[in-house]
Regions:
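Divalent metal-cofactor coordination and adjacent catalytic microenvironments
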Residues: 1-139
């Protein structure tokens, strides 16, 4: 799904006819290119599909363990967390999966905060210890 449809773009460009489909392909191309440029400018990482986009999509990030209770994800707003692993050995087995009940997501900020009452109360500090799979972007 595009950030804006060809019909919506035509409503803002008075010289284009709303009933004509001649410019639709061009508008779709321009919209998708703008989406990629905007996402790169805003610091988004590539989605799992390989493209830069501010549209909602799946992200898989391998992050250095920040230590402490806070994990900052690159793409925002985060709308769902698929999984978060904290594994200094970078194997990301089920034993290293952080239970969703053990953290709180602040989606607009892209912040994951470990709860003090969970099994995991601090992130490790190893290189690429964190594997986060999540959905972020605008729909």
């Amino acid at each position: 799904m595009a950030i804006i449809t060809a019909a919506q773009a035509k409503a803002y460009i008075p010289t284009l006819s709303a009933s004509s489909s001649t410019d639709d392909a061009l508008l779709v191309t321009l919209t998708s290119r703008f989406d990629a440029v905007a996402a790169a400018h805003l610091g988004y990482v590539r989605q799992s599909a390989g493209a830069f986009s501010i549209e909602s999509g799946t992200y898989i990030e391998y992050l250095d363990g920040p230590g402490g209770r806070e994990l900052h994800l690159s793409a925002k707003p985060v709308t769902a967390i698929g999984s978060i692993y904290d594994d200094p050995d970078a194997e990301y087995t089920s034993d290293e999966l952080i239970a969703s009940a053990d953290y709180t997501l602040y989606g607009i900020e892209g912040l994951v905060m470990l709860d003090t009452t969970g099994a995991d109360t601090y992130f490790s500090t190893a290189h690429r210890a964190i594997k986060a799979t999540y959905t972020a972007g605008y729909s």
